[in-house]
Amino acid sequence: MYIGPYQLSNNLIVAPMAGVTDRPFRTLCKYFGAGHAVSEMMTSDQTLRMSKKSLYRANFDGEIAPISAQIAGSDPFELAEAARYQVANGAQIVDINMGCPAKKVCNKLAGSALLKDEDLVARILDAVVAAVDVPVTLKTRLGYLNGHENIMRVAKRAEEAGIAALALHGRTREDMYLNTARYSLIKEVKQMLNIPVIANGDIDSPEKAKYVLDYTGADAVMIGRAAQGRPWIFREISHYLATGTHLAAPNIQEVKDVLLGHLSELYDFYGEYSGCRISRKHIAWYTKGLRSSNEFRQNMYKVESTAEQFNVVEDYFNQLLAQGEIMSDVQVEQVNLLETK
């Protein structure tokens, strides 16, 4: 699959997730077989550009190309300027966020709230595409309200504006993350457009990825929440698509090694204070369903230093290994549920 002149190594893409898809997470997912990754959304508000959070999000140093920076906002001029800034900062692809359902984003008429104003959508698309000489992509949803899905018009207008690829989440803003993703509309959009279409929503297993690709005809799938604490899902899906067989689930030693490596990267990237706090959610995701994990997490949340946090995690996994832990009943049940979806 191509996005503009860039050929991706495969059709598995890491979804942009605020507070999750930082550079360490994107790098890890690419290591495990993701063909592409999109950054966390970055505000187009110039007054916030030099904030600590914005600088972390715009850090692409040493990242595997192509580098994709997602921008969010509601003012065409500001978004165009933000696109130029991110390209100057190293972005090779600019992604426009019209899909975030978060209340604090939609209250500013950004994210998926933009779908309420198709004229504004068109002006933003035209402004950003005209502002930069790199491919511009769009991440969006089926519409703002159920029963008023306008994705067919928005998608066609995006293609006319020169958007290089469309990533489509199969829900409306009203749905948030409830109900099930509606792949039938993604299929209709794919049949209408000539640009690549990336299917997103509820893709949480190798079987589901294959089903969505086959059913929708999409050029790629975008995986978000299912990769939290499970970055090897890209390797699993890639193997299944190529062979029709499953890779063995990682054992406890492998999970330990991946998590400790991830923590080291987070500490190096964010430093002592933020590194410790940002790592907590990742530790929780990696350990979900493991033996005595609830008690472990409650104790882990109280740790205030990276060194102690690292040691606490290492000790927990060493205890699991000593007890012969392979995979808990909870995890087995979760995997079985995923594979039947």
Regions found by a protein language model. Give the residues of each.
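Alpha/beta catalytic cores of nucleotide-metabolism and tRNA/nucleoside-modifying enzymes
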Residues: 4, 8, 12, 18, ...
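Glycine-rich tight-turn/loop motif centered on a GG-T
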Residues: 103-120, 171-183, 245
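Non-cysteine beta-strand/loop elements that form the S-adenosyl-L-methionine
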Residues: 39, 93-101, 160-170, 223-226
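Glycine-rich, positively charged N-terminal anion/phosphate-binding segment
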Residues: 1-2, 17-92
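Active-site beta-loop-alpha junctions enriched in small/polar residues
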Residues: 17-19, 42-44, 72-74, 99-101, ...
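Active-site glycine- and acidic-residue-rich loops that bind
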Residues: 77, 140-153
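A contiguous, low-structure linker/loop signature
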Residues: 84-104, 110
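Hydrophobic faces of well-ordered beta-strands that scaffold small-molecule active sites
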Residues: 12-16, 37-39, 67-71, 94, ...
